[in-house]
Amino acid sequence: MKNRCLYCYEPLSEGERVDYHAKCCRKLFGTSQAPILPYTSSEVRALADEVVRSQTTVTGVQPKLSLDFDQMSNSPKRFTIVGLWGRFILKPQTERYPHLPELEDVSMHLAEIAKIETVPHGLMRFSDGELCYITRRIDRTGQGEKLPMEDMCQLSERLT
């Protein structure tokens, strides 16, 4: 998606070297500038596979990692991979299902058009340019306490 915002899909201004409009950044990340994702897609895929094997993953069937802002970096903010308690969930590309992050993001956009409430979500680039899906977690309070919520796996009576 060249020259389009990875949050709203609308065109970016001519010559802009960013992936989001400032207002879209605030909606997704809570900042006017997108945080840096300092990992390559292959590094994250290897980490996600390791996390799935160790069974310390966010529930669901896709490989995913929990992210939060690196408290040591100020401007621009940087993401770091954390345990289960991060404020964001990142879903990388998978070999089995090409373009799954893009499909999930466009599905969420279609849900919004149908007036279905969704979590803040968008696409993001790894340091090598490959796209991944990112969403802000809404199943935790600001203090990290779990909020009761159902996801599609639970609705389909699939164990996660």
Question: Language-model segments: which ranges?
Answer:
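Regulatory N- and C-terminal appendages and interdomain linkers associated
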Residues: 1-42
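Conserved ATP-binding subdomain of kinase catalytic cores across diverse folds
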Residues: 43-159
